[in-house]
């Protein structure tokens, strides 16, 4: 399953071409919409402070809670089918953070600091 955004989609198609595993677009894997913070540097103090407000939609964006809801719902669906298949999710750092929080308890600080490198492979078992 892959995000509809170009880099993730290209990566998933490459993986599919090499492995023969079918790839399918999953709209819920799209990165969080950061509203007024979209296309701004992620390391800035103002952005870091804004991320502490989990219920804030960043003036037209998507709150952390809404993001978690859509990813948790997707993971619940995958879990229901996990006896049948193994899934590869190709997505973004914000999505990886939510997936990590689905499988492991995290403090707010751990959640905010969590990240994976581009094309990293992380395995989770239900």
Task: Name these PLM-found stretches.
Residues 1-48:
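Phosphate-coordination/substrate-recognition cap region in phosphate-metabolizing enzymes
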Residues 47-66:
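Short glycine/proline- and acidic residue-enriched helix-loop micro-motifs
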Residues 9, 72-126:
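Active-site-adjacent alpha-helix immediately C-terminal to a catalytic or transition-state-stabilizing loop
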Residues 2-3, 69, 90-91:
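Short beta-strand scaffold positions
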């Amino acid at each position: 399953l892959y995000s509809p955004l170009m880099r993730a989609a290209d990566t998933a198609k490459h993986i599919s071409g090499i492995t023969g595993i079918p790839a399918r677009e999953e709209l819920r894997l799209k990165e969080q919409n950061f509203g007024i913070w979209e296309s701004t540097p992620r390391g800035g103090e103002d952005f870091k402070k804004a991320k502490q407000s989990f219920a804030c939609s960043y003036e037209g964006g998507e709150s952390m809670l809404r993001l978690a809801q859509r990813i948790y719902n997707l993971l619940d669906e995958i879990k229901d089918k996990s006896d049948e298949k193994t899934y590869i999710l190709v997505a973004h750092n914000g999505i990886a953070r939510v997936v990590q929080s689905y499988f492991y308890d995290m403090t707010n600080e751990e959640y905010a600091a969590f990240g994976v490198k581009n094309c990293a492979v992380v395995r989770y078992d239900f």
